[in-house]
């Protein structure tokens, strides 16, 4: 029997719910607290701690339809996607799980019942495999379920492999829960090439694995040892795409309903008539992984999960380009995907606008260089004497044009070439080494200046210090002395001036000598030195002079308050929006603060209000802002967050505000959170795909912002009230005018029935009040007659009937309007000379009005 993919999903979940299982929502594609996984790649990932006995849940049986991604890391299907019938970057894994509840016998019985009774698969099309030494599973299949012994295949360890290295001994990764498994295969028929599992021809497509039942008995440690789990458990997985293909009578996963709708939509968008084109399959697969990854918080980037996402997007865009796509196209498939995925796309539907925007921007950015990069790649392939493209060219395409190596490999493979992967990796490592070497130096505020001096910062506890001048620079050149009016950089041996770092702007102030005054406008890092940028206002200043360095204490205090508020803001955002929020940049000034962070969509007014509430609550608690020096590992164990883009030494400063915020920070802060006074967000907006920016003020500036906002609201409210009154007056005048004009036009439609004037008309855009006015106007113009008017507004029918007094003995308006109303799903009534009604079936209005003439004729 045919079942849609959505029906298969629902049938599976309902079946196991009837067997006492708790239906658990799919977890995020980003594994929670599991650094061993790049992406969620199996249904059991979210239950890992349950299998280990480290987590107790309110249920011991669970069932899920888990979204999974396999692209990057150990489980990487990217290169095969689109070129085989069953490889995908994204798939759904149906699963049922037992946490120390039932074990092999029930698991096998459940699987067999669902397949043969719920889905009604022919038993003679199914065969099973068990681990070679798992006699218990063999006996259950054979003696209790009744599967013939010749349809049960024992699978041992791979030749030359390690113990337990078998298709029928499952591991999640190098570590974690594992155990023997039994797999169920479906026989697609003799007309398809392929052999039974365990034979040399097993890689054929005749016998397809549809369900894997893993019997979790061990926890595998990094050294390879197997520790028995506290209680044996069960983890099963069945790819929804494979079982849907069987239920829909097709062989390839790409022929099922979900993929066919995506393939057809893609073909229509890019203008491709050949629905069997492999590029259409690639795009249909990739829109699934990309959309759901973005919806789960992954953003395109050049590292980690973000880079895998970027690779998939760019691979899809390249295949669209190959099909002749004009302009951006990929993001247009998100809406189709949200529709075809049914109940699995609830969260995607909420995030649809954000997902579309991220994909569109990424495609636009890559599209600018794709065409040129393809020209260079094809020229390089044309010039090859052999069959391998060198690693340097592959690296150039990556470095200059953003071509991931696997995309280059795709193009090369299509032309029967390979790429030098080792050479590419060598070039990549050389680039990483150059970056490491460059990263050893501080920011060059002026690239021409090279300074060997080293400054010591002593400003955490002081804003004034005596110090010696160790270097002077004017226009990038070192000099021995400064004269009044010189714009220069002064390097001191010790300084209380904070150099810009971690988003906190540099200090300003003055350097005083007995004979001169240097105005410090900004402070920056210069190698290992601290550079005071400014102008010599009076006198002279020479290398070796002793100065009194005085920081602008009032400005410093304002900056420190805003910096502490930034930490509170960061923590509050993570509480309100989620732990996916990560700092992407900040700027802390005396006037205000700016904070950039990762988030997929605009922060709502309610969320901003809650963030403000949390921050101000911490301010009122007046936490002591504690600073502790510790090694980086201890800081991480304490849960300290590291700031975006910052490089830390082995010893770090850990800043804590109660138990609300703990961050690594080398900046200047207030003594207590209460010093901040008040916190007010002044703006929130997007600055890039998936990156939001909040600007805020504190203290007196926050009070001023609140007052200004209140005044602005009052002005807007008054303006709105005035405009509303004016518009209401204009609208009524227009309605009266339109009614009068319409009445004049309708007179031409008057006809006679048995010597009586009759007007029946349908008017669009007029409300009931206007219709009543028309009826009165028409009565006056006709002198004697019967009027029936109808209109449709907001898909609802409005009806008005009018009869002059001389005719009410024969025709009553209430009866007339009720006759028409009954035909449009309504009812009504009124006086003999005027009546009104309503209805719900707007499509029936024309035929209902057409029946009026005959009805009137019968009564005259």
Swiss-Prot record:
Keywords: Aminoacyl-tRNA synthetase, ATP-binding, Cytoplasm, Ligase, Metal-binding, Nucleotide-binding, Protein biosynthesis, RNA-binding, tRNA-binding, Zinc. Binds 1 zinc ion per subunit. The keyword RNA-binding applies. Pfam families: DHHA1, tRNA-synt_2c, tRNA_SAD. Residues 824-843 are annotated as: Disordered. Zn(2+) binds at residues 563, 567, 665, 669. Its EC number is 6.1.1.7. It comes from the Bacteria. It is found in: Cytoplasm. SMART domains: tRNA_SAD. Belongs to the class-II aminoacyl-tRNA synthetase family. This is Alanine--tRNA ligase. The lineage of its organism: Bacteria, Pseudomonadati, Pseudomonadota, Gammaproteobacteria, Vibrionales. The gene is alaS.
